[in-house]
């Protein structure tokens, strides 16, 4: 049997014997351990599910709150945009219909709706423009908000300013000047430049009780009252004088023509300032200019001839006149004092200045008269209904407007009233909104053209007495560059004031040069066309009011 053992015995001795039921033997301890581990894993899964649920609920709550906040902010933004659109665009009876992008109905015209806003109109071809407080600033903001997809040029003058400031790193960053080769300019540069134009006739330091516009209206009212058929009395207001400006300027033009016939050299609109005069404020006690400053001014001669003024400011006898005027008012004998008191008493009470004594009011008033008289001579020289050659369209600022061409070929106008319309629908509302508004704030474009005309001829105070046939080179750069640089660099107040007054003196001289021409329109249009994109009367009117004229450019 020993030989058969291999057939019934295992060749290897088993270490672990198999269970009777062929299953593994597991102790109670192992089973409890496995159950505990399973319970822990299950508990972790349940807790993780609760945490995920809480996080999802919290995320949903935050998303709902964010959605509500975004909806609220969106509603506020939409209401602001709607208010801006309503403030800037509306139509009234007899004007061009304006449609918005969101609604095809005409904008409301109820007085309750309109009284919340201020409104002006520039030309009879366009609808009224509504604004809140700052007309020109809101126009600039509206233009740049709507001009994202286009490139616009503002003329070579603005482009030269951009190139000058581009070479100065500090000003380049502050004015956000990037691409010097592009004809367009930044919003910051345009805003700073237009602000400098607006401040030309606003004296920043010397406290004035009345603006140059108010002083001019007082002088014109006194002049007009010397005619028998004048339409003014004690109830007349400054607004009434503004509406009467066309009538007054026709009389004024006749007087100037009469003086010119007597003396061809008698149409001088300048002032005889001493050489190297730097500041506009009178240096003699802060009230009087040098003797003979007003002696050759044609408007002063005319006022003396009409009996509006008793003495030429600066004469020796005028000192006694000043004392008498201060003590007794001189209401009976002095027409200018009387009408200044009548027109300014509602605003100033009894503290009404006398122009012969406070001569800066007389000088600023004469400059304002020159400005308005020049506009009267230019704006009514061509009808807006003629075939246009200019490229400016109001849709450049307001894309919602519909381009309507009112021009006619070979149109012959019988009664052009561009100046009258501008006075009634622009100057009067602006004066009612801000009764200390000045000429440069009303017409910054006029300041730009006249100052550049004076700078182009190289005029300076020290050259004021040079012969008329002498040619003066330009020894200084653009005065606006120096003024803007002084403001941006926060230089001393005296330095800023000197550069401001340099612009003011150039403006006075530019008016004198332009008014001395028989046809000043051609002179101004030539300057405005080469520097500011002006090509016709429509362009010129908008440039006068805005101080800039955006024209689409293909770059």
Swiss-Prot record:
Q: Name one GO cellular component term.
A: host cell nucleus
Query: What stretches pass through the bilayer?
Result: none
Q: Where does this protein chiefly localize? A: virion
UniProt KW keywords: Capsid protein, Host nucleus, Host-virus interaction, Viral genome packaging, Viral penetration into host nucleus, Viral release from host cell, Virion, Virus entry into host cell
* Function statement: Capsid vertex-specific component that plays a role during viral DNA encapsidation, assuring correct genome cleavage and presumably stabilizing capsids that contain full-length viral genomes. Participates in the interaction between the capsid and the tegument through interaction with the large tegument protein/LTP.
Q: How does it assemble?
A: Heterodimerizes with CVC1. Interacts with major capsid protein/MCP and triplex capsid protein 1/TRX1 at the pentamer vertices. Interacts with the large tegument protein/LTP.
As for family, the record states: Belongs to the herpesviridae CVC2 protein family.
Full protein name: Capsid vertex component 2
